[in-house]
Amino acid sequence: MSARRLARRAAAGFAAAALAGLAALLAFGYRSGGDDADGAPALQATAEHAARGAYLARAGNCAACHTARGGAAYAGGRGIATPFGTVYASNITPDADTGIGRWTSTDFWRAMHHGRSKDGRLLYPAFPYTSYTRVGREDTDAILAFLKTQVAPVRQANRPHAVRFPYDSQLALAAWRGLFFRPGGFEPDAARAVDWNRGAYLVQGLGHCSACHAARNVLGASSAPAALGGGLIPAQDWYAPSLAAADQAGVADW
């Protein structure tokens, strides 16, 4: 067999392997979180649950993104600039038609834990589900109880995202998830105190501190949630200082 034919076969084999790998990556990224069974009890929207949810919603600063300047609370519409285009926050008021009024607790859990909407769409990681995946089910249920019972419904359609091709496709999101996202939960450190673990749970999960205070790669993925060494917030020209270095935010010395 000639060297040219061997080279062609090798190239064809490499291409086939690359395509197979890409297909596996897309399948993994797209299917992740798509087949959860709803084994959880019905949402307990009691006053106690709603009060806990209000506390958690403040801890996660949900209103900051989901409220447009001068707009109704939690009604969405605020644009979040990214290097790939602008993502507009959604309406999370309990309006049945334009908000999350028809969402079940599992729909909400799937969005928080898996980054997947009620209709099955993959969500843009501008919604920091890469951090929220560590939030426990009891806490996501409490947040939903607050949103459904303590927030006024606002009829306001979600604004379409303005994200450039090819980043605007579900295939691109599936590939990104296959590379950079794994659903998971918070793993407490048995060697640490209860308060330390509670703080780590908030910092790495609901507080999503790494969304600003950690460096990102060219595809927008941030480093590990515990790596809070500071980073430039993409498309905003603002540097979020290190939360560890004494010569920056200096939180370690507080």
Question: Which stretches of residues belong to each language-model region?
Answer:
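N-terminal type II signal-anchor transmembrane helix
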Residues: S2-A37
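C-terminal capping alpha-helices of c-type cytochrome domains
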Residues: G21-A27, T104-K118, S131-Q156, D253-W254
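Electrostatic cytochrome c docking/interface patches
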Residues: G34-R58, A175-Q204
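The canonical Cys-X-X-Cys-His
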Residues: G53, A59-R69, F108, I143, ...
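Extracytoplasmic/periplasmic/luminal assembly and interaction segments
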Residues: L56-A96, I100-G101
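Extracytoplasmic
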Residues: A57, V87-A89, L122-Y124, G207, ...
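Electron-transfer interface patches adjacent to heme c in soluble/periplasmic c-type cytochromes
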Residues: T82-D107, T130-E138, A226-W254
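Extended, well-folded interaction surfaces typified by the phenylalanyl-tRNA synthetase beta subunit core
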Residues: R155-L171
